[in-house]
Amino acid sequence: MSYYFKNLKPDLNSDVEEDDGNLLESIMANKSKREIDEQESSDDELKTLSFGSLKKAETIIDEEDFKDTKPVHKKPITTTYREESFDEDDDSEDKSDEDAGFFEEDSEDETHHGQKVPKKKSKHAPIEQSSKKRVPRVRNIPGLEIPRNKRSNLYQDIRFDKSTGKALDSSIIRKRYQFLDEYREKEIDELQKLLQDRKFLSKIDQGEREEMEQRLKSMKSRLQSMKNKDLEREILKEYESDMNKNNNTRYHLKKSEKRKVVQKWKFDHMKAKQREKVMERKRKKRLGKEFKQFEFHNRR
């Protein structure tokens, strides 16, 4: 029952206005007493709280105010950072339900926005690479890759490397490095002297001796082939210069014609015994071809 009905007294003959005024005064007095009692009780509760709990409550309120006023960043906050903040504020979450609800909302937003969805600008755009990633020391430069069939040959001549530019003419390269023939001849002479020395041969085994002989043979054949190419180049140069003396337009020989010119020059400058050997070799070769064309060779 309300306070108004409790204070009603039976058999009162006073005026209604006076009763109403007294009633209002009594209500206001009771209300002021109640407020004073509540203030005293709240002060007593604050006195019983420790400084640590008051400090935690103050930090929570400051964080809430800072997050309300903080501008929204485009970059989302990672979930690991939020988990660390949970560990720090475990006590405050247990005490207040409001704080727990606040952190739950933040975690939901982070899980929603935490995953970065890659977006492609254009299909014709160049490849993007992070500047934070270290560049490897060994890189595949486009245009300089070694094909698979030539990867076994690791040691290549730098004169024919693609990085130096276009491939030059072999005649120009030969002129530049023709002085190396002297070193090759000296090396061949030294190797021949070693193979003729009996003391040196007694110190090495049979395998090393065969290897040295094979190397000497290959060096001689390589040097001879270089000299033969130089001779053929000079022959063709003289022939073309004689042919184009009185011509306004320069005429160049085909490969088949070049081969015939070189063979003719060599045959003319051979000795009699060498010519006989060459003619005998060609005759045997021709007879062998004719013999293979007989009918009994085609039987199965």
From Swiss-Prot:
Region (Disordered): 60-146
Coiled-coil regions listed: 203-232
GO cellular component: 90S preribosome; nucleolus
Main subcellular location of this protein, as a coarse class: nucleus
Residues modified as Phosphoserine: S14, S41, S42
Biased composition (Basic residues): 114-124
Assembly and binders: Associates with 90S and pre-40S pre-ribosomal particles. Interacts with CKA1, CKA2, CKB1, CKB2, PWP2, UTP15, UTP17 and UTP22.
Functional description taken from the UniProt entry: Component of the 90S pre-ribosome involved in the maturation of rRNAs. Required for early cleavages of the pre-RNAs in the 40S ribosomal subunit maturation pathway.
PANTHER family named among the record's database cross-references: RIBOSOMAL RNA PROCESSING PROTEIN 36 HOMOLOG
Protein name per its UniProtKB record: rRNA biogenesis protein RRP36
Species this chain originates from: Saccharomyces cerevisiae (strain RM11-1a)
Top-level taxonomy: Eukaryota, Fungi, Dikarya, Ascomycota, Saccharomycotina
